Amino acid sequence: MIGRLFRAHGEFCASHPWEVIVALLTITACMLTVDKNNTLDASSGLGTATASAAAAGGSGSGAGSGASGTIPPSSMGGSATSSRHRPCHGWSQSCDGLEAEYNAADVILMTIVRCTAVLYCYYQFCSLHRLGSKYVLGIAGLFTVFSSFIFTTAIIKFLGSDISELKDALFFLLLVIDLSNSGRLAQLALSGSNQAEVTQNIARGLELLGPAISLDTIVEVLLVGVGTLSGVQRLEVLCMFAVLSVLVNYVVFMTFYPACLSLIFDLSRSGVDMSVVREKAKGSLLLKSLTEEEQKANPVLQRVKLIMTTGLMAVHIYSRVAFSGSDYDAVDKTLTPTLSLNVSNNRTESGEIADIIIKWLTMSADHIVISIVLIALVVKFICFDNRDPLPDQLRQSGPVAIAAKASQTTPIDEEHVEQEKDTENSAAVRTLLFTIEDQSSANASTQTDLLPLRHRLVGPIKPPRPVQECLDILNSTEEGSGPAALSDEEIVSIVHAGGTHCPLHKIESVLDDPERGVRIRRQIIGSRAKMPVGRLDVLPYEHFDYRKVLNACCENVLGYVPIPVGYAGPLLLDGETYYVPMATTEGALVASTNRGCKALSVRGVRSVVEDVGMTRAPCVRFPSVARAAEAKSWIENDENYRVVKTEFDSTSRFGRLKDCHIAMDGPQLYIRFVAITGDAMGMNMVSKGAEMALRRIQLQFPDMQIISLSGNFCCDKKPAAINWIKGRGKRVVTECTISAATLRSVLKTDAKTLVECNKLKNMGGSAMAGSIGGNNAHAANMVTAVFLATGQDPAQNVTSSNCSTAMECWAENSEDLYMTCTMPSLEVGTVGGGTGLPGQSACLEMLGVRGAHATRPGDNAKKLAQIVCATVMAGELSLMAALVNSDLVKSHMRHNRSSIAVNSANNPLNVTVSSCSTIS
């Protein structure tokens, strides 16, 4: 019941973050603006009236009271009570003689408290820093700052204390702030993938942490509050500060902190890649420990706390109520306001700004100690702690393993057998060495004892349950059941059993945990393929958002292959500067393209998208040639074409039929639909529209037989003259003029040499080879590199690499170079397919073309096509210059085989070039 209340409270704070934060700030502002003068005046008036009444009563009762109406000492309830309960309370009033209590013992005690608070706060922040998440560390720092602000406000206004007393009060707040709980809640919140999941995670965290924290707060308040009953003014002040620290920390943690977590996620989801933060949060030890089993309170400890709470409440009730009817209380109520007013009016104000500054800047002994501690901690963090401990551990792992091996006395044969048995256990032990140990050091003795330690920590490994029992758990909808309740070995046994319960190709959706599904699939494939153990270890699979891969990019996933991504640029295109991402494993490609960008950007590249249209060409058959000709004529009729276009356009918001080319081959028709597809590459969009158009044509010609939705007249992912002639995708043309000075300084050549090489190589040589669309040097290199980086279909480089590179001598003296690149079939898009993957999406963002254009659909895809064509021009120019200068082999040797020094000047022909990537 209590847990559900905290869960509801957490949902409210997380779903209404602005309201909670504004309400808390409003309350704080009200505390800051409270006018205590009215309260003081009322209290003074009451005290004066009461004193007058007492004086009148005293004079009327006889001479025993004195003519002045002074109350005798006997009426104050005895010396014992007076000494214990003074009428001046140090936390709310200015008391004479209070400064005298700042003796040597007090200075020593407060110095110890301050140093302890600083060290404890430093320890907590270092613990959070080791998690590797700057977001959690920043949120914890925000929590500390806001708590300090509210605590300071309460000290100054709510308790009426002096500003100078903050030097003692703030250290008590640092002592009670527990950043471990705030770190747990922050990581649990940041593990959510959307706002609704974050809200539920915060509510779940408060449900688990709230009851225990609330009980601890009550116990701490009652326990520390006993000090306020001591009658020792200095102790009462310190205990009151501590009590208020506990309360402020609890209020901020239960209200401001969950609202702040929810708000930070909501504001940062468009500007911060939260997947990195979520992966760090999911992989941390804190989040792994935040489970129901770990957070279940110890019943014995809970009972002890309840007993302590009851006893402490009894102490407080007795101490505060027992003397409520005594004479002391009457006198205290009578005299306290008057004495407080007199002291306040007669004492020298120590809270003036100048006095406070002088007092705080005075370097006493305790100030020197605190300063030394702070400086030492800062130096320690900067010079020693702010390093990644993993390299130190890796450097020590070799000597440690050797020392452990040397310390063994097991015979070699037995050791070999045990090594095979404990392969899996040793892997787990190595993992635990990096996650459990706080120190990065180890020795031989600790290494040899790790296996028993593992069994003590993890517990005995349970054998897999029967398959039928595992199936019942897998299909159960009860809480605590489902795939999460099964071990990896049990999932493997279910897959091996066959059936439709957990097929290997759908294991991610069955487990509802894609990364775990990929891990188990790797185990199964490794076993079925009889691979050596660890063969797939170098193929990464962790820390990847597979939800964006499933049903979009790849099936039967085993992991991912990292490809280096470089950039070429700056590239000045149509007045804008771009840094073009290129993913490749071919050395010198990015460097060569970058050199071309440097030459082109002197005067800039101009581009134009001449035509747009994705194609799909179904193949249909008719009973006779005459019937096929009749159908061709019917489709080409303008009125009938509009009917077909209406059916085609009804399948998509962006797909619009633009043209229809029909080729007849006997009784077969090849109908090539051409459509614009917005910012998508559009093959699936056109296929869907073509299918709907064929259905409409079939209504007019029932004897038409659909042979294939794609009849290779499109033509997709194959060299084809029709794409070279009629185009497919985006038809882009770029041009640029390179000055003679740029040719000499950047490319080390001249215009006439480049023009002659282009004529003989790209035109004559391509014609001799019968190349289709190959009138270029190496356009496919740049096209494929940009395609891989931006999430395009890599296989479409076959069609997209069609390029005609032309060069002419320019200007009056013919020393400048005029260059154009025409690419009639660039198939690119900025939405769909691989463009949604995190890395590829980042590269599109780098170019400013991620996703669909907000106002003009299709503009982002056009801009990407223009960038690709301009990048191809840069690569073409640089390679042509390298060819005429004999720099090609030299550059490839330098970038691909740096250990081989090639001296082309002294020995230009005696070089082995078989290891070069590609020489066009």
Swiss-Prot record:
Its EC number is 1.1.1.34. Keywords: Endoplasmic reticulum, Glycoprotein, Isoprene biosynthesis, Membrane, NADP, Oxidoreductase, Transmembrane, Transmembrane helix. Highly expressed in embryonic gonadal mesoderm, where expression is initially broad, and then becomes restricted to a segmental pattern at stage 11. Expression is then further restricted to a cluster of cells in each of parasegments 10, 11 and 12, corresponding to the developing gonadal mesoderm. Not expressed in pole cells. The chain crosses the membrane at residues 12-32, 107-129, 136-156, 170-190, 208-228, 237-257, 364-384. It is a multi-pass membrane protein. Pfam families: HMG-CoA_red, Sterol-sensing. GO terms for molecular function: hydroxymethylglutaryl-CoA reductase (NADPH) activity; NADP binding. This is 3-hydroxy-3-methylglutaryl-coenzyme A reductase. The lineage of its organism: Eukaryota, Metazoa, Ecdysozoa, Arthropoda, Hexapoda. The gene is Hmgcr.
